[in-house]
Amino acid sequence: MPRFLNGWLTDVVQASLSRPKIEKVRDRPIFSLKKSIISAKNSGLNPIIAEYKRRSPSGINVDINIIEYVKFMENNGATGISVLTEEKFFNGSYNDLELVAKNVKLPILMKDFVVSEKQIDSAYNIGADVILLIAKILTERELVSLYKYAKSYGLEAIVEISDEEDLDVALRGNYDFIGVNARNLESLEVSLDRTKKLLQMIPKDRLKIAESGISTRQDIEELRASGADAFLIGTSLLKDQNKIKELI
């Protein structure tokens, strides 16, 4: 069982533990997010992971065509696609992930509260290339174990942090990426200043992804100056898809 949690995180973890494994034969190759980010950076672009979510703490509640959205992002230079699959609080689904996997040739992140191996089985089977492991909801032993399990499939993993305690845990492992979430998962408050501070504490040889609260070119430039290698953006792109042309 994941570490002791409070409030809505307890509910979301319990819901995650009870989700069934999706039995399906994967029908797409694995696309590397790491290679995609490095390629974008070498081309002088801002590597943007465009996120699709139906609902979130930011207040967004969208019903736009998922296939049209992700193909627009792919055609306009997105480095990867993130798909929210958590059901209870974000109204996501594995079906959303499957739709994206069938329609883009970009690395796909299954954005969820991963706490069990069967969720990783499902991610691989459906067609994800990357999973999210949130340090805040896992013990360090669980984090290491789930990371190794994901790697056994050839998947990449983002270890997400939101404070210095999480950062200490993330730096003890040789993980593919460290994602810095501007949103505090307990209070749901967003602080890009905290993101910048944490980014500056991460060694330069680690690939770092800034997550949440990003809406302007200036946000990206400031985060990049603090050490971010890539930017996971959802709400602002869902509200205005053309914004990717400005941010890229």
Swiss-Prot record:
GO molecular function, one term: phosphoribosylanthranilate isomerase activity
GO terms, biological process: L-tryptophan biosynthetic process
Classification via PROSITE patterns: IGPS (PS00614)
Enzyme Commission code(s) on record: 4.1.1.48
Keyword Lyase: yes
Domain of life: Archaea
Transmembrane annotation, as ranges: none
Reaction(s) this enzyme catalyzes, per UniProt: 1-(2-carboxyphenylamino)-1-deoxy-D-ribulose 5-phosphate + H(+) = (1S,2R)-1-C-(indol-3-yl)glycerol 3-phosphate + CO2 + H2O
Keywords annotated in UniProt: Amino-acid biosynthesis, Aromatic amino acid biosynthesis, Decarboxylase, Lyase, Tryptophan biosynthesis
Pathway stated in the Swiss-Prot or TrEMBL entry: Amino-acid biosynthesis; L-tryptophan biosynthesis; L-tryptophan from chorismate: step 4/5
SUPFAM superfamilies: Ribulose-phoshate binding barrel (SSF51366)
UniProt similarity note: Belongs to the TrpC family.
PANTHER family: INDOLE-3-GLYCEROL-PHOSPHATE SYNTHASE (PTHR22854:SF2), TRYPTOPHAN BIOSYNTHESIS PROTEIN (PTHR22854)
Xref: HAMAP family: IGPS_A (MF_00134_A)
Name by which UniProt lists this protein: Indole-3-glycerol phosphate synthase
